[in-house]
């Protein structure tokens, strides 16, 4: 069975001018995945569950594991010096790696270090999301905010790690999506899901229906559509919502479905972050044959205006996302 290391080397060999920087970043992420996998698996036995008592830049209480994952990723990237800078959902500003190697590095990375961390103390799947861009500031100088404020269509790689019944690393470099399952007996990620494709049609819708009254009319209509009985379209669909974006998206990637986190009266711009969640998940979805929009626009074409900008997200099987967007358009003001 092919390992992640072998796969990365093979892909790098397809580009004669490649110098291995991107491969080095992926190796750092692989290391991060192993460390977080180890600590999550013993979370109930160590003092890393619960709240840290600190709020992040969004005013949300940070879980202890959020901070652990954030600090672990920052340390792994700084040690390898393969990136010029790093931005995290858990930090107010970006971090420039202001060393000689850091200033001469070509890439920057944005991450949600631990998505769904509020679920960890009840043993529900969580994940890490990452997004990699080529910097736009001059090589040899420290990175600037402009390097991080790029639309998703400029990503060179993106992926996630899902920590569940097994730990999987799923990523794309713009040439399809591949998944690697961690074998703890040998400490290696092995290629288990080659060229992943999201079904064009799906039967699963994932949304927090407890917030129904706060949703836009187009979303309410789509939920009712999913619940109606119609043999021709195999409805009603199945409702499945874990509350962890990575876990919900991973299931829908494999089985077909739609994940929706819309705007709401209490979150008029949506709740998910464009740069840390929306763009990388959208890149993966499109590379697997799916679609990702904010209800009206392609996610990857949105020009960011702030490092922690929020965005509504409709992502999944093509037919389902297009139907939801059609209903959103009906009520567009």
UniProtKB/Swiss-Prot annotation:
Gene Ontology BP, a term: gluconeogenesis
Chain positions recorded as Mg(2+) 2 binding sites: 112, 115, 277
Cofactor note: Binds 2 magnesium ions per subunit.
Binding site for substrate: 115-118, 208, 241, 271
Compartment annotation: Cytoplasm
Pathway: Carbohydrate biosynthesis; gluconeogenesis
InterPro entries per UniProt: FBPase_C_dom (IPR044015), FBPase_class-1 (IPR000146), FBPase_N (IPR033391), FBPtase (IPR028343), Fructose_bisphosphatase_AS (IPR020548)
Catalytic activity: beta-D-fructose 1,6-bisphosphate + H2O = beta-D-fructose 6-phosphate + phosphate
Secretion signal, residue range per the UniProt entry: none
GO cellular component labels: cytosol
Superkingdom of source: Bacteria
Keywords, in A-Z order: Carbohydrate metabolism, Cytoplasm, Hydrolase, Magnesium, Metal-binding
One Gene Ontology molecular-function label: magnesium ion binding
EC number(s) stated in the UniProt entry for this protein: 3.1.3.11
Pfam families: FBPase, FBPase_C
Binding site for Mg(2+) 1: 89, 112, 114
Cofactors required: Mg(2+)
Family named by the database record: Belongs to the FBPase class 1 family.
PANTHER family (alphabetical): FRUCTOSE-1,6-BISPHOSPHATASE-RELATED, SEDOHEPTULOSE-1,7-BISPHOSPHATASE, CHLOROPLASTIC
NCBIfam families in the cross-refs: PRK09293.1-1 (NF006778)
Subunit structure: Homotetramer.
Record protein name field: Fructose-1,6-bisphosphatase class 1
Organism expressing this protein natively: Haemophilus influenzae (strain PittEE)
């Amino acid at each position: 069975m092919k390992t992640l290391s072998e796969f990365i080397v093979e892909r790098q060999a397809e580009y004669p001018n490649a110098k291995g920087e991107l491969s080095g970043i992926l190796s750092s992420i692989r290391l991060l995945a192993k460390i977080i996998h180890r600590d999550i698996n013993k979370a109930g036995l160590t003092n890393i569950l619960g709240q840290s008592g600190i709020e992040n830049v969004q005013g949300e209480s940070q879980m202890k594991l959020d901070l652990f994952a954030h600090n672990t990723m920052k340390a792994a990237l700084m040690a390898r010096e393969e990136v010029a800078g790093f931005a995290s959902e858990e930090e107010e500003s970006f971090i420039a790696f202001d060393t000689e190697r850091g200033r001469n590095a070509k890439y920057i990375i944005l991450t949600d270090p631990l998505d769904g961390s509020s679920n960890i103390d009840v043993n529900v799947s969580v994940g890490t999301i990452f997004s990699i861009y080529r910097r736009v500031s001059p090589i040899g100088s420290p990175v600037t905010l402009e390097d991080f404020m790029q639309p998703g269509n400029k990503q060179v790689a993106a992926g996630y790690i899902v920590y569940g019944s097994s730990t999987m690393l799923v990523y794309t470099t713009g040439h399809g999506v591949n998944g690697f399952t961690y074998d703890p007996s040998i400490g290696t990620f092995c290629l288990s899901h080659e060229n992943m494709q999201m079904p064009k049609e799906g039967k699963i819708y994932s949304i927090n229906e407890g917030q129904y009254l706060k949703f836009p009319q187009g979303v309410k209509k789509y939920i009712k559509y999913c619940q109606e009985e119609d043999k021709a379209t195999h409805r009603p669909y199945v409702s499945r919502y874990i509350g962890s974006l990575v876990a919900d998206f991973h299931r829908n990637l494999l089985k077909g479905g739609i994940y929706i986190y819309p705007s709401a009266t209490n979150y008029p711009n949506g709740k998910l972050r464009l740069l840390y969640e929306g763009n990388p998940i959208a890149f993966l979805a499109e590379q697997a044959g799916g679609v990702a929009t904010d209800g009206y626009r392609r996610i990857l074409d949105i020009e960011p205006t702030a490092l922690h900008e929020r965005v509504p997200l409709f992502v999944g099987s093509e037919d389902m996302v297009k139907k939801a967007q059609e209903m959103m358009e009906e009520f567009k003001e």
